[in-house]
Amino acid sequence: MSKFDTSALEAFVRHIPQNYKGPGGVVAVVKDGEVVLQHAWGFADLRTRTPMTLDTRMPICSVSKQFTCAVLLDAVGEPELLDDALEAYLDKFEDERPAVRDLCNNQSGLRDYWALSVLCGADPEGVFLPAQAQSLLRRLKTTHFEPGSHYSYCNGNFRILADLIEAHTGRTLVDILSERIFAPAGMKRAELISDTALFDECTGYEGDTVRGFLPATNRIQWMGDAGICASLNDMIAWEQFIDATRDDESGLYRRLSGPQTFKDGVAAPYGFGLNLHETGGKRLTGHGGALRGWRCQRWHCADERLSTIAMFNFEGGASEVAFKLMNIALGVSSSEVSRVEADSAWFGSWLDDETGLVLSLEDAGHGRMKARFGTSPEMMDVVSANEARSAVTTIRRDGETIELVRASENLRLSMKRVKGEAKHDIIGRYHSDELDADLLLVSEGGAIYGAFEGFLGKSDMYPLYSVGSDVWLLPVQRSMDAPSPGEWKLVFRRDDKGEITGLSVGCWLARGVEYRRVQP
């Protein structure tokens, strides 16, 4: 690493309120176990005019996952010790069951339970109880890929871990975290507060400077996948604990942050609640977190004993800020990609028959395309006539076929262009046997709308948009968790007579949920 330059970090931080507009936030940089930069700005609550401080607690959301895995390693031991308990937990399973290690590494193939809550009729601002979480997870019978073969983000993995840990130890996760993680690390005010409705020390905001900022409503109860609330000072203490134990081969963070592989031996991007990343040739470990009204991110570079943290009480770019702080501290500069103009033959929708996933491409100008495939849009650089890349995805076009590669997910898809005109004979009621949930499709004035119904309630009506013959998109931009699943892909099946018999409903988080038609 080049000479550490705090002035460049300070200059970047001074402009955060201007470049990332929102109510407030905090950032920090820790080097060699010492705080070299910490800053708070804005307000924890706009109405009460409560300032944001270094000691203001905020939900750290999915950053909690590494702490759940830390408890597993510290209070239980190796993940394999809970494999029998997981088999009993997933007692309705028909496919190959994942192992507990697969849960820790997001290789289980289980569909994300927050995404599935949408299919079960959940109200985005509704109450979600622990019993409902278990009911949803325990009804699962299948995975959307063979465990250990790919990466797919799944909050339910860590919710199940929490349940298994509590059952094994006979203690609450609240108590174990406090005793075995927070106290040794000096995280004085960190606490697992499972009920998001009970946290009122800081307000998270939806919106932006165009629509305005409004307090976000959250009423879910979660544990394992999220739920910890902590201040910047608490998170600094965690980074200092990591640094202080760096030379201990049995140290907790060293065990959490080791390299992981898929079952075929290929390096994996995630392990024990940590993203395993690289920048400027340096290995990073960390995680982001999101809930309606909140965003946060931490990164750690063990080789340089360097950590960055960003926490916002609005839906801004905390992940981008923490990553930029890391790059500035490491002296890594960004390079401009050489681009060519996108040929119109790229544009449109492309379907992978096996997964039911759809890639939608549109021109974004200046040699870029906007791609919709995962939970949020990606900007792709068109690097040649038949190849485009984003940070996580590479696509190559050969006539009417696109090869999509996400190397970090061990995923390679062959996608065909979606053609033809959509028929409107899809209206009716469809049933998922696995979820015991329905999808209702209706036509109003020639427009098609869909609604989900299940044990969590009945959803609003959502408009459907056709992209070709028997392939429709159903956008859902608000859900109990954040970010939302995005576009649900609906791929219909017909019999030999051309009659609709059912469909596959899926998104990146929850692929290929099968429905059969029960009522035209």
From Swiss-Prot:
Asked if Hydrolase is a keyword of the record, the answer is yes
Substrates-to-products reaction catalysed: Release of an N-terminal D-amino acid from a peptide, Xaa-|-Yaa-, in which Xaa is preferably D-Ala, D-Ser or D-Thr. D-amino acid amides and methyl esters also are hydrolyzed, as is glycine amide
Region Important for specificity, residue ranges: 477-487
Question: How does its record describe regulation of its activity?
Answer: Inhibited by beta-lactam compounds such as 6-aminopenicillic acid, 7-aminocephalosporanic acid, benzylpenicillin and ampicillin. Inhibited by p-chloromercuribenzoate.
Q: Which family does it belong to?
A: Belongs to the peptidase S12 family.
Q: How does it assemble?
A: Homodimer.
Report the function annotation for this chain: Hydrolyzes N-terminal residues in D-amino acid-containing peptides.
What is this protein called in UniProt? D-aminopeptidase
> Which species is the source of this protein?
Brucella anthropi
Q: Which gene encodes it?
A: dap
